[in-house]
Amino acid sequence: MSGTLLAFDFGTKSIGVAIGQRVTATARPLTAIKAQNGNPDWTLIEKLLKEWQPDDVIVGLPLNMDGTEQPLTARARTFANRLHGRFGIKVTLHDERLSTVEARAGLFERGGFRALNKGSVDSASAVVILESYFEQHG
């Protein structure tokens, strides 16, 4: 086991991607994947899985602030199930509340408004999701 994890921040138009290492508990963004109504280009995801060979995949689970599910929650679960079904990899859902807010703040701090494009925010959110996962699961 390499200790490599791949994280996705599911969205209907763009899916953020991050790669991380369990040993160092660090993550970095990769290029976001465009999606059409929540359907990604599965060949790009297959390419990522072959290139990085993660032990696990983490998918952000969008929840309301009170912990209840929202319309996007079921779609993120479906995405996670499809990842597992297509590629046979272990997929873990992880609470992503406030990940986009934190990602936007970090990007703005480093690059102002110019840094706040959709793809960079989505992949930065995937980094936040993965770092949060590391904090909770080591």
UniProtKB/Swiss-Prot annotation:
Chief site of localization: cytoplasm
Enzyme class: hydrolase
SUPFAM superfamilies: Ribonuclease H-like (SSF53098)
EC number: 3.1.-.-
Record Pfam families: RuvX
Classification via InterPro entries: RNaseH-like_sf, YqgF, YqgF/RNaseH-like_dom, YqgF/RNaseH-like_dom_sf
A biological-process GO annotation: rRNA 5'-end processing
Cellular compartment(s): Cytoplasm
Function noted in UniProt: Could be a nuclease involved in processing of the 5'-end of pre-16S rRNA.
Family of this protein: Belongs to the YqgF nuclease family.
Protein name as annotated: Putative pre-16S rRNA nuclease
Organism: Cronobacter sakazakii (strain ATCC BAA-894)
